[in-house]
Every structure is written in C-alpha cells, then in structure tokens.
C-alpha cells in the first residue's frame, strides 16, 4: 500500500505530514521510527498525522510522533505546518482552524502575509500538570544533575518543558545537559529542554533539546515555554522575538491564565509516496 505524504518544515524543524482524512491506514510507532531515519528512511524530526475529528467542536485531529517512535502531545512548529497543509490540500477552506491534540485544543490562523498564528492555550505551571516532581509550584526549581545543582523553570505547553537561562547560546551545554535533563527522574514523562540567552527586554536566543529527537533547528512549544519562563521571572516583556537556529518566532503572552500566541512561517518542501 502506497501512502501520499508531504515533507514540510517550520524554521528547519522538519516534518513528514500524512493525510489520513482522504487516505486510510493504521500508523504505528514502528513506522515513525523507520521513516524518521535520515539514512535509511525519509528523515524528519516529527511525523504529523491529520485525522478527522472525534469532537464536533473542532475541524481536525492532530497526532504527533517523534522520530524515535514516541507519540507526543504537542508541536508548535508542526501546528503551523498542519495549518498550511490542510489549506493546500483543500481539506478545509477555513483560515481559522480548531484542532484537537493529545495536549488539548489549539487554534490556528492562516494570515494573508503567509505567516501562521497559533493560539497555544494557557501554559500550565502546576508541577503535577507538567508533569514535574516538586512539593509546590515555584518560578524556578533546582535539579540535581550528576551532583551539580541546575536551576530551571518547568512549564507545560501541552507538552513538558524545562527552561535554563544561559549567558552564551553558542557555548550552552545543549548536548551534555539536554539528554540528562530529558531523562531526569523528576520529569516522569521526560522533558524538552530549552537553553535561553536573553538579549534585551524583547529579544532572546534559544536552542532546544527535544524529547525523543535531540537538538532541532527550532521548537515552537519550546519558544512558547521559554517566553513564559522569561516573562514570569521578570527577565523579559511581551511581545518577544525569539531567534532559534532555524529562524525567528514572535511570541505574545499577557500573563497567568492567558493563552500564548505564536507566529511564524510554514514551508512545503516536496511531495512523495511511501510504502506501508
């Protein structure tokens, strides 16, 4: 059986997108792992699956698999690609699209300038909701990593994030600390790890070690989580411009209980077919 797919990226964070509205297949974690291999497969950070909604209040269901086969709750860069995909494939004519994810409902807005806005919903900061093991909620936590205390913020954007402030983004220990914090026992569902350098009150640089994918060119939910951490701790003010290795995202957040708004591009790379 051959399945049509589209290769897309959001700031270099790359995706294989499958339409399972007009095609029918049962996708398993082993398929994501096989196709995600950059040497023997298609190669991607995440596999995005477009499905018909199970909820009448939304337009589509959105599922996400990392290249290691793990299914995750949310992907911000993927959400922008999702919006571009369903419009390009004429699965909808709407430019404001409501999508059901494992992490909750998000709202997508395809703008006339080609940029795509995503209402990511309100961040969750209660430790049990992230999930993160801590006796009480705080702006910052200290985590022991190989006997060394590491200060970080913990935020859920529908998926778990740890945010560390660094003085130099170029020398940040992304590949050393990233996997250790990702698998830290205080994050029982594992965690995405962001390394944030604040430039001024409205600009920052970010690198992200993604759970199940390693360092990626960009991470939309990571940028949202970093913005929440930076604004909460008084380092920065909304709106923010966050530069990632793959490009820039605009993030707005009005404070606790309010949704995080992310704006950025989505690009189609090529169309293909893969055998299931």
From Swiss-Prot:
Localization, per the record, is: Cytoplasm
**What NCBIfam families would the database entry show?**
DapF
Q: How does it assemble?
A: Homodimer.
Task: List the GO molecular function terms.
Answer: diaminopimelate epimerase activity
List the keywords (alphabetical).
Amino-acid biosynthesis, Cytoplasm, Isomerase, Lysine biosynthesis
Q: Name the chain's protein.
A: Diaminopimelate epimerase
GO BP terms: namely:
lysine biosynthetic process via diaminopimelate
Q: What class of enzyme is it?
A: isomerase
Known role: Catalyzes the stereoinversion of LL-2,6-diaminopimelate (L,L-DAP) to meso-diaminopimelate (meso-DAP), a precursor of L-lysine and an essential component of the bacterial peptidoglycan.
In terms of PANTHER family, this protein maps to: DIAMINOPIMELATE EPIMERASE, DIAMINOPIMELATE EPIMERASE, CHLOROPLASTIC
The residues annotated as site (Important for dimerization) are 270
Q: Catalytic site residues? A: 75, 219
What's the chief localization of this chain? Answer: cytoplasm
Instruction: Identify one Gene Ontology CC term for this UniProt entry.
Output: cytosol
